[in-house]
């Protein structure tokens, strides 16, 4: 399922999560850990609802998360 959007999102999410565990991050944004893992492995496209939750959590622009802005 790799496409530019999925790959960019996975890389940006990895950078933002940093040293935090996937389980801790998943708990904070109320998204199942398996879903976060699949995002990071480029196995699933992020839903709009989850994209907004992640952007809000980090105080980031959605365009940044999907690779449309540095």
Task: Kindly give the residue locations of the regions a language model identified.
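Short, locally clustered residues in the helix-turn-helix/winged-helix DNA-binding domain
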Residues: 14, 41, 55
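Short amphipathic recognition helices of helix-turn-helix/homeodomain-type DNA-binding modules
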Residues: 64-70
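Conserved hydrophobic/aromatic packing and binding residues within compact polymer-binding modules
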Residues: 13, 25-26, 36-39, 65
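DNA major-groove recognition helix of helix-turn-helix/homeodomain DNA-binding modules
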Residues: 49-64
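Short, Lys/Arg-enriched C-terminal cap helix and immediately downstream tail that follows
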Residues: 16, 48-49
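A short, Lys/Arg-rich alpha-helix, primarily the initiator
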Residues: 1-24, 28
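Recognition helix of helix-turn-helix/homeodomain-like DNA-binding domains
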Residues: 30-45, 68
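Short coil turns linking two alpha-helices in DNA-binding domains
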Residues: 21, 32-35, 47, 61
């Amino acid at each position: 399922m790799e496409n530019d959007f999925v790959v960019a999102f996975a890389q940006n999410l990895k950078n933002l999560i940093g040293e935090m565990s996937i389980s801790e991050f998943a708990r904070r944004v109320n998204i199942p850990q398996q879903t976060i893992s699949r995002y990071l492995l480029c196995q699933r496209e992020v839903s709009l609802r989850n994209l907004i939750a992640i952007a809000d959590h980090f105080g980031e622009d959605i365009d940044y998360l999907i690779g449309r802005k540095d």
